[in-house]
């Protein structure tokens, strides 16, 4: 939680306010909560959107209820992040983010079921319009520098000499 708050505080020190912050897994769930509950009334922060990616719903980052007090979040936050009498950082991310992604379209569907949702399926179903699956890795057909129509000079591993032309 400290890292999440520090990351948001750092934005002001750098005078850098991104359009989107991409949060990965339960460790970054607090950033979404801090942004909405504490920072959102401050103009530069109010425009920042969050994308929360979950790779595996089994890992939920569950802590004692007193964690909320230590984090400095408002008391009403409890109703949004309570999970079986504990605070769930995963739930913080899912509830407070603007968009949710996961590792595939199939997994995005599966985690909305009781079999794979690990207790979060209700939240995910209620936010299904903001949930998508994106396959890990690169699409080598769509992103092939030997055939890509959007680059100036085509190249491949056997002939990388034209790669530099695309950086001019």
Label for each model-derived stretch:
Residues 1-168:
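Catalytic cores of nucleotide-sugar-dependent glycosyltransferases that transfer UDP/GDP/TDP-activated
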């Amino acid at each position: 939680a400290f890292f999440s708050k520090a990351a948001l505080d750092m934005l002001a020190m750098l005078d850098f306010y991104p359009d989107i912050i991409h949060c990965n897994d339960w460790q970054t769930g607090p950033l979404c909560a801090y942004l909405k509950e504490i920072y959102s009334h401050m103009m530069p922060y109010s425009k920042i959107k969050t994308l929360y990616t979950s790779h595996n719903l089994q890992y939920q980052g569950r802590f004692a209820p007193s964690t909320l007090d230590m984090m400095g979040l408002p008391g009403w936050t409890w109703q949004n992040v309570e999970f079986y009498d504990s605070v769930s950082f995963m739930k913080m991310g899912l509830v407070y983010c603007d968009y949710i992604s996961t590792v595939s379209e199939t997994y995005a569907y599966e985690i909305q079921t009781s079999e794979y949702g690990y207790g979060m399926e209700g939240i995910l179903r209620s936010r299904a319009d903001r949930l998508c699956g994106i396959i890990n890795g690169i699409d080598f057909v769509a992103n092939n520098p030997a055939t890509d129509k959007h680059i100036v000079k085509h190249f491949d591993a056997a002939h990388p000499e034209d790669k530099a032309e695309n950086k001019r």
